[in-house]
């Protein structure tokens, strides 16, 4: 997520034409894939817009599902291309790509296809990914829940330092927003948060409780973004947990989400 923020603000060379030349070369798929690995996904996303349909379809096959998903997550700023690119994939292929994306990024893509195609794609997604997407869609456009990501780390407050680190590593395989670790009690109620650095430097003999910030801010999913945007701007945290009415963590609102909301205001 942070890479996405940086790619929007840091000035850099336009590599799209270089990438196009690589893709239009007569090199093997393996060689092209190796050359593409030297470029940032945002640059490849820019290059895709310059390709003809046949070359794009070849590119999707070269990239594979995971890499295509990373690249498609950078298309949200150019929605006019999204529907065309998605229809170049079969429904099953497109659904596979969406499953590999963060749910909020998948929603950004789905928002830019027809209602019929949206429902078809969602119906072909695996249950966990589908549930995350449907959760976000269950909130109105102006509610926090509609802007949240389901990419977060959550652990129990009764773990030892060693157990907490082990749980972090396990969850990080699927969730890469690791800078802030959310904490719940035995009833799955939000308890607080831990800064990643504090967990890394903690000694095994310390109690997890000693590094939990129980006053860490949170918001409710049904809150209006417009009504709490000023409060959110005051926080410098990478992310803030989003709770349901039972104070269970269902998502997170990230710094990039807040920046986008401020820009819209």
Question: Where is each model-derived feature located?
Answer:
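Hydrophobic packing positions in regular secondary-structure scaffolds
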Residues: 1-265
């Amino acid at each position: 997520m942070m890479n996405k923020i940086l790619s929007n603000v840091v000035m850099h060379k336009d590599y799209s034409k270089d990438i196009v030349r690589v893709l239009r070369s007569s090199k093997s798929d393996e060689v092209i894939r190796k050359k593409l690995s030297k470029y940032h996904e945002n640059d490849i996303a820019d290059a895709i817009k310059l390709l003809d349909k046949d070359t794009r379809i070849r590119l999707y096959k070269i990239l594979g599902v995971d890499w295509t998903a990373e690249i498609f997550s950078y298309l949200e700023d150019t929605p006019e291309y999204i529907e065309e690119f998605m229809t170049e994939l079969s429904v099953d292929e497109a659904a596979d790509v969406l499953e590999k994306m963060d749910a909020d990024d998948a929603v950004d893509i789905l928002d830019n296809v027809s209602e019929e195609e949206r429902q078809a794609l969602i119906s072909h997604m695996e249950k966990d990914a589908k549930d995350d997407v449907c959760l976000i869609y269950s909130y109105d456009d102006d509610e926090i829940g509609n802007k949240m990501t389901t990419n977060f780390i959550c652990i129990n407050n009764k773990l030892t330092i060693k157990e907490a680190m082990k749980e972090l590593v396990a969850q990080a395989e699927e969730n890469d927003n690791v800078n802030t670790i959310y904490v719940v009690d035995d009833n799955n109620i939000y308890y607080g948060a831990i800064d990643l650095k504090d967990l890394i430097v903690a000694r095994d003999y310390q109690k997890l409780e000693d590094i939990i910030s129980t006053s860490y801010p949170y918001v409710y999913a049904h809150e209006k973004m417009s009504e709490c945007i000023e409060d959110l701007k005051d926080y410098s945290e990478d992310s803030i947990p989003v709770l349901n009415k039972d104070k269970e963590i269902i998502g997170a609102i990230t710094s990039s989400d807040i920046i986008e909301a401020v820009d819209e205001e």
